[in-house]
Amino acid sequence: MDEHELESSREARRQRFLDPNYYHAMVGFYLEDAKDLQQQLIDNSSYLDSVVRIHESIAYDIFELFSLRYTAGEPLGKLRHDFEDVVAAYERYAKYDRQNEGEPDWPAFSFTHIDDYVRCLALVSIAILLRQDLLPRIHGLIAESAFDGQDALYEELTKKFIPDRLEIDQWYHNLPYRYLLDCIDSDTAEERIADMQSYLKNWYKYMKGCGWYDSHKNQGPEGGGYFGYWAWEAAAVAYLYDLDDTSFRDHLVYPKDLVAFARQHAPLDQEQHPAQYRVLPGEPCPKTGEWMVGHTPRTARRFTKGEMMPELNLDTGATIWMFVRD
């Protein structure tokens, strides 16, 4: 890169830690790694354990590249479109992992592990801000699993979008998330802002257990683990609870432009992304595609427009078919 390109990259980046040369090297790495992983899938197609591991690596790479592109300053309109690729990669991983485990509701994320928990909250939060139509699919990654309905922050983030969320007083990781739960539960705008400031102030030091912690110190032409430090869930809460973020919007880990984008752009409408279609048994299918009952992955089936939707005898209650994808 020449000096002009370097300066342009520095000005565009959303976080000052990102080295432009490292960014361009990592983009090349992820693209090459994608080719290598696809070849590994071909070579190991008969070994389900290996297929699961490879799809997990693919999903990690796609999400990390998405985050790195955000950190580098890519336009949100482009990232909004590409976020579906991240979700689809995790769906493929979940599909093969569930086959391997012999459990149709096996979770793609283990909330007891901080890396998994942070990443799941990131997917949910980014979707709230950019692609609310993808939230049912993201929830499908942990729906009906041992972690579904067990974490207060997850329930708070998803309750406006996913039915049958619970009011609970338990969570998997106390700090820093206690500050954010306090923010949600506070009675006044002033208290919420103070709690959010505490959350952002303390967020990074409690991420020490994550594999990417302090990765900005090891950026080089041969790679590294840094793709940005972002408290995505703080932005989601600020948006959902309409917080005035003037006093904390310039905090290093607060993705302020995502909140501004979400406030300026209405959610993608149902005609473009009809993920919110709901149909009862005996009613005609309004759109050809994949449907499932209550975000329960094992019920997923494909129906043709005009086909009568069936009743299923489930222990989860009434059958309500929800559109997933074309």
Model-predicted segments: where are they?
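Eukaryote-skewed repeat-based solenoidal scaffolds used as protein-protein interaction platforms
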Residues: 2-220, 226
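Residue-level detector of short, conserved catalytic/binding motifs and their immediate flanks
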Residues: 121, 235, 289
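Alpha-helical oligomerization segments
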Residues: 191-277
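Disulfide-bonded cysteine-rich modules in secreted/extracellular proteins
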Residues: 274-287
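Extracellular/lumenal glycan-associated surfaces
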Residues: 286-298
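Extended, polar beta-sheet/loop recognition surfaces of beta-rich domains
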Residues: 297-326
